[in-house]
């Protein structure tokens, strides 16, 4: 009788662990909890070597799982995520899908700001400067100056003279010269 009670108690406790296994994005923890934390660490461990080797095709699925389930777990999700998304954008032939992938890349930058924007060396200003540079590079003539001016202007207003040089450079490089403004009148 005692064995049946113990087995029943053990079975009930094992089933309840599934209820506690939540994704990091849901719980606000870096790795989640329970089985999800193991899956998160596994996905990070699997995509990083592929990405380091430049094998972005094999890295993508593992990276995407880590990015969506435990976005605050590790900076590598964003360091390699930008490269993986850039690869996907450059290999995509359909213009509509390419535009959607560019939007997804911009979201990767936004998510990095959310989780790692307070990094001392590579903080919000550094991240937004790279976001704007990639937006301009990938959109080309279709880049909307109002969009990246808003991003860069916010960062420059927030950080002032301590703003990332690349952000200031992007803003100045893409700003119309006084002569261009005069000619457009």
Description of each model-found segment:
Residues 32, 67-72, 111-123, 157-163:
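Flexible helix-coil transition and linker loops at the boundaries of alpha-helical arrays
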Residues 173-180:
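Conserved small/polar residues in nucleotide/adenosyl-binding loops
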Residues 35-43, 74, 122-130, 160-169, ...:
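Generic helix N-cap/helix-start motif at coil->alpha-helix transitions
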Residues 22-80, 84-90, 95, 99, ...:
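N-terminal leader/linker segments that initiate helical-solenoid repeat arrays
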């Amino acid at each position: 009788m005692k064995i049946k009670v113990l087995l029943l108690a053990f079975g009930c406790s094992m089933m309840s662990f599934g209820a506690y296994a939540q994704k990091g994005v849901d719980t606000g923890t870096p790795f989640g909890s329970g089985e999800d934390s193991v899956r998160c660490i596994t996905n990070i461990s699997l995509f990083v070597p592929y990405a380091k080797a430049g094998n972005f095709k094999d890295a993508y699925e593992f990276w995407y799982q880590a990015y969506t389930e435990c976005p605050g777990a590790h900076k590598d999700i964003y360091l390699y995520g930008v490269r993986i998304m850039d690869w996907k954008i450059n290999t995509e032939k359909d213009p509509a899908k390419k535009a959607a992938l560019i939007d997804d890349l911009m979201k990767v930058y936004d998510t990095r700001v959310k989780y790692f924007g307070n990094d001392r060396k590579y903080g919000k200003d550094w991240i937004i400067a790279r976001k704007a540079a990639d937006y301009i590079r990938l959109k080309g003539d279709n880049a909307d100056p109002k969009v990246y001016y808003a991003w860069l202007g916010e960062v420059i207003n927030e950080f002032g003279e301590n703003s990332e040089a690349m952000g200031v450079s992007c803003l100045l490089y893409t700003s119309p010269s006084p002569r261009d403004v005069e000619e457009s009148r």
